Amino acid sequence: MFEDNEERRWFDFLAKKTGMYAQNGGQFDMSLQVTIPNEWEKIAPVNIGYTAGIETDKIAPGWVERSALMDRITVISEHAKYGFDNTTYEATNQQTGEVIPDFRCTVPVTSVSYPYKHIETQEVSLNLDFDFNFLCVAQWSVRKNLENTVRGFVEEFKNDEVGLVLKTSCRNNSVIDRAMTNNQLENLLKPYPDRKCKVYLLHGDMTEEEMTGLYNHPKIKGLVTAAHGEGFGLPIFEAAYNGLPVIAPDWSGHVDFLYAPKKDKKGNVKNKPHFIKIDYDLAPIQQTAVWDGVLNADSRWCYPKQQSYQSSLRKLYKDSKMYKGIANKLQKHIQTEFAADKMYKKFVEAMGVKVDEDTTEDLVVFD
């Protein structure tokens, strides 16, 4: 999603300014490299790598090697941090021939979430036949597991007047891609000609205001994801801070913001799930998902259990008012604990810069 707004223009200006400075022989005191770890380089006295991390349970060997070029690393979830902190390999020093049995990232890794953003709502006109509809926002890919997401929905609601709005694309938001995506969806639904439930394809560019309108549409009752893994899960985060009930596996990046403190009967406060959990198994990623240097064949991610997924859909359908109440509590928690000023302060401190209360007043916050 690309938008020509103040924040985008500010980033473009800084990128252009930085490029011109480097071309003229300028030297940097510190580099913040926002890219995939394969591209990290030592280009300044202090170098900080910033990445979304990984959707599986371990990072690639090349990432471990490149992490040594950084002084600090910042990621966007505890799941991504776990991958950097706990992945180990057996390696050989190419210069000495020494075998390293515990080759790992030794650089400090900090997790800093995306911030909550207040976005004005723009009404989205959807021609939905039923009052109860689920929403899924994901690119059509192996990792997002859309085939099983759609198939499980249809199997569960083939005799019910329920809808699934699928905001998706295969590669981009072009007209050609829309035809390709529509064709894939039609083929997936062919075995169910007599179903009562309906699946709607929503394709194309949408602004942040329109997406907010989608999350707050009166006929959209919950967001569902059966993805194998997330580095963070931005659409899930957006849905949650808009007060939309969420159905998701209890694994990977999105669990950071789907839990909130809750008092038990004894008055003890514990972090509790504020979403409907899908049971899963951890297993090696599919061969079609292997990405050399990024997603290793021996890495694992979650495989949502289909029956658990379908029963989770049914739970929300049968008791949407209760789950909406839980979602509203999570919304308040996110808006407070993931507020922009808190996240920006945490991000700056992750770079080794101490931020006092007076300094935070000068932070530029893009709403």
Indicate where each model-derived feature is located.
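Donor nucleotide-sugar binding/catalytic pocket of nucleotide-sugar-dependent glycosyltransferases
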Residues: 72-121
